[in-house]
């Protein structure tokens, strides 16, 4: 299994294979998920002090905060997958 990495902003990289969801932090349920992850010690803040614009939820129950828009992260994820499909295999 190949490890696919995705840039989530400011040089921070996450394994794309582990991402379950990329969501906006605005709703109350997502804010609750962030608070619960902080209490469990499963929160990773990759915003560098900037405003949180995307919340990435992984299959290991880690919650990652990013200062990049969810659409941008999703586009990077899709473009990485498309690039791998286009690569010739010998």
From Swiss-Prot:
Against InterPro entries, the record matches this protein to: RemA-like
Q: What is the lineage of its organism?
A: Bacteria, Bacillati, Bacillota, Clostridia, Eubacteriales
Name of the protein in question = Putative regulatory protein Dred_1699
Disulfide bond sites? none
The family annotation for this protein states: Belongs to the RemA family.
PANTHER family attached to this UniProt entry: REGULATORY PROTEIN SSL2874-RELATED, REGULATORY PROTEIN TM_1690-RELATED
């Amino acid at each position: 299994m190949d490890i696919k990495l995705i840039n989530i902003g400011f040089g921070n990289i996450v394994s794309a294979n582990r991402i379950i969801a990329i969501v906006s932090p605005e709703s109350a349920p997502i804010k609750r998920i962030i608070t619960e992850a902080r209490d469990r010690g499963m929160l990773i803040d990759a915003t560098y002090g900037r405003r949180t614009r995307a919340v990435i939820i992984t299959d290991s129950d880690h919650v990652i905060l990013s200062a990049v828009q969810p659409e941008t992260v999703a586009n990077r994820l899709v473009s990485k997958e498309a690039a791998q499909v286009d690569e010739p295999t010998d």
